[in-house]
Amino acid sequence: MNSKRMLLLVLFAFSLMLVERYFRNHQVEELRLSDWFHPRKRPDVITKTDWLAPIVWEGTFDRQVLEKHYRRRNITVGLAVFATGRFAEEYLRLFLHSANKHFMTGYRVIFYIMVDAFLQLPDIQPSPLRTFKAFEVDAERWWLEGSLVYMKSLGEHITSHIQDEVDFLFSMAVNQVFQNEFGVETLGPLVAQLHAWWYFRNTKNFPYERRPTSAASIPFGQGDFYYGSLMVGGTPRNILDFIEEYLNGVIHDIKNGLNSTYEKHLNKYFYLNKPTKLLSPEYSWDLAFSPPPQIQYVKVAHDSHRKL
């Protein structure tokens, strides 16, 4: 073997070694639940579901481990909100200012704001990590129920561009205010929000849709938790799957002369498609109630007495 050929073989072997080292150093390992979730630290509350999904409470998660993992993934998170109606402008101002301060701080965030033509967007201090995109909802759709208009519009935006822009997406109601950090402990493939009031009721008789002909129907004696409708999260693909099921359910009910609520359709979806992560009532506390001892920090608050 001549020296030139030997040199080429050595260089080839060296390049393979560099490539292997690069991918080893840049590979993001999957995060195990036990790496960041410590349910025994909160014996006063339910911290796992029957299908072993974590229920995130303050004190159950290791923020440093989560931060290290998601920073290596270099993620972008989307937050979609729908603002129309009498109090929409006031709510949107509080929502966006508080979200800009507490939602996924230190990460790239794209806010998707869906509004009617008459709404004045609030001034927000610009940041390199924050992008705000406003979309006017088609006026021809206003005869439809609000949740139906919003979800149909959100589904169209996910298909056309959101799925290519973010790794995770949250859809939240505008009549909420972030009060403490809403961070990467909330991320997952399919994330549900426990209903703040129903979580603390000692009953299995949740207000599910019970009419058997409704697409949202859950029979008596069945069901896991009662989920609130103010927030849903996950990957864009999973959010789109939910939206498609919700819209199909609404069409089914209309054909049968029924009109079930968005929240009941949401609960039916999570009954059939178990969420991979649940957020405690700390992440959507109703200001109409005094927090019980289990609520250590209210992350997000809403006022159920005021309607849009």
Swiss-Prot record:
Q: Which residues lie on this side of the membrane: Cytoplasmic?
A: 1-6
Membrane-crossing ranges are 7-23
Annotated residues that bind substrate are located at F82, A83, T84, G85, R86, F87, A173, V174, N175, H195, A196, W197, W198
Q: Which residues lie on this side of the membrane: Lumenal?
A: 24-308
List GO molecular-function terms, semicolon-separated.
Answer: hexosyltransferase activity
Q: What's in the GO CC field?
A: Golgi apparatus; membrane; vesicle
Q: Tell me which stretches of the chain form a coiled coil.
A: none
Could you tell me which Pfam families the record lists for this protein? Glyco_transf_6 (PF03414)
Membrane topology for this entry?
Answer: Single-pass type II membrane protein
Enzyme Commission code(s) on record = 2.4.1.-
Cofactor comment: Binds 1 Mn(2+) ion per subunit.
Q: Where is the active site?
A: E263 (nucleophile)
Q: Which cofactor does it need?
A: Mn(2+)
- One annotated GO biological process: carbohydrate metabolic process
Under SUPFAM superfamilies, the record lists: Nucleotide-diphospho-sugar transferases
Q: Assign the protein's first listed, main location to one coarse class.
A: membrane
Which keywords annotate this record? Glycoprotein, Glycosyltransferase, Membrane, Signal-anchor, Transferase, Transmembrane, Transmembrane helix
Its annotated compartments are: Membrane
Q: Does Metal-binding show up as a keyword for this record?
A: no
Going by the UniProt annotation, this protein carries glycans at N74
Q: Does the keyword Transcription regulation apply?
A: no
What family classification does the UniProt entry report for this protein? Belongs to the glycosyltransferase 6 family.
Entry protein name: Glycosyltransferase 6 domain-containing protein 1
